A protein has these predicted regions:
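Extended, basic/helix-rich recognition subdomains
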Residues: 166-169, 189
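Charged/polar, solvent-exposed surface patches and flexible loops
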Residues: 21, 171, 194-197, 247
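Long extracytoplasmic/lumenal interhelical loops at the membrane interface
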Residues: 173-231, 237
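Hydrophobic transmembrane helix bundles of membrane-integrated enzymes that assemble
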Residues: 1-167, 220-312
Length: 319
């Protein structure tokens, strides 16, 4: 948590757009290098042949990134970051090219989640670009906040055994909603209940703050937030994302909203953003960019404040 706070604080007062361009090009160069080394047989596996939980063996390409889902995930992150940086300058054919690249990569990775989220991100970027005035409408930001809260809410409910109603005899769920969603998530929810002795990740293993023993890895990202860091930091994380959506609205940052919403849906299924490698969560850069303008932290000629200085605001109000 301290690393994340320091990371956000380091972004304060910097040209985050310029920083994100550096992140974009260095990440893309690194991924292309890994793919080239893998294709040449020098480093990393080109493809994996296994049963990926679908009941049959298949060959899926990863090009040195370890797993097909990871390959499509990195493509998705680069597309979203590229759209955030250059969406306003893009022509219609650029979206067509991105759609085609996404489909071509899907033929190699067969990563359903990565393909669908990337598709939604490209489509959302196109809508923001061509629907003039949409990024200034309050309702789209309210809708984005609702989607984010639904993603968090479902993740919490899925981790609660009294809601999910796991059946430890047949390894299924008696709750029809959870059972139906799990049939499309390829074992993500099942892993919480049947993947470890203590049912790591379920609400029974959560604590108010982080515990040294809570270090188990699983895919569901929002569940990992509360399991790894604790309930209180998890709630702070939720509040910060809602605040970030509000800042998107105030700054008419439509592409920022698209990025946050599609990544929220992705984080229900995957934990790419909830990782010890905090630099790959591009939303943290945006939190840092907007942190200095937290309501009440600066006014007129007052010294600029940090987002974690909120308690000072309440002390000022009492005076």
């Amino acid at each position: 948590i301290l690393r994340i706070v320091a990371f956000i604080g380091a972004c304060k007062g910097t040209d985050v757009k310029k920083l994100l361009k550096y992140v974009f090009y260095t990440t893309m160069a690194g991924c292309l290098l890994l793919m080239a080394l893998s294709a040449a047989g020098i480093y990393g596996r080109l493809a994996l042949e296994a049963d990926f939980g679908r009941g049959y063996t298949q060959v899926r390409y990863c090009f040195g990134l370890g797993h097909p889902n990871a390959l499509h995930c990195m493509f998705m992150m680069l597309v979203l970051l590229g759209l955030y940086l250059y969406n306003e300058k893009m022509k219609w054919y650029a979206y067509v090219i991105l759609f085609a690249m996404n489909h071509a990569l899907y033929l190699l990775t067969d990563s359903n989640t990565g393909m669908l989220i990337t598709f939604c991100g490209i489509f959302g970027g196109g809508v923001i670009h061509y629907w003039k005035g949409l990024k200034g409408k309050k309702w789209i930001y309210l809708a984005g906040a609702v989607v984010f809260l639904l993603c968090v809410g479902f993740s919490v409910l899925a981790a609660e055994s009294r809601f999910a109603e796991p059946d430890y005899v047949i390894y299924q769920f008696r709750n029809p909603l959870v059972a139906e969603v799990e049939s499309h998530l390829n074992g993500r929810i099942r892993d919480l209940y049947y993947g470890s002795i203590r049912c790591e990740g379920t609400t029974a293993t959560w604590s108010l703050f982080s515990e040294p023993g809570n270090h188990y890895y699983f895919d569901m990202g929002f569940v990992r937030v509360f399991y790894w860091y604790g309930i209180v930091p998890g709630l702070v994380y939720v509040i910060l994302n809602i605040w970030l959506i509000w800042r998107f609205y105030k700054n008419k940052d439509g592409m920022g909203l698209v990025m946050l919403v599609v990544l929220s849906v992705y984080t229900v299924v995957e934990a790419h953003l909830i990782s010890v490698y905090i630099g790959r969560n591009y939303l943290l850069f945006l939190m840092g960019m907007y942190a200095a303008v937290m309501p009440g932290l600066c006014s007129g000629n007052e010294e600029e404040g940090y987002i974690w200085s909120v308690p000072i605001v309440f002390l000022k109000l009492k005076k």
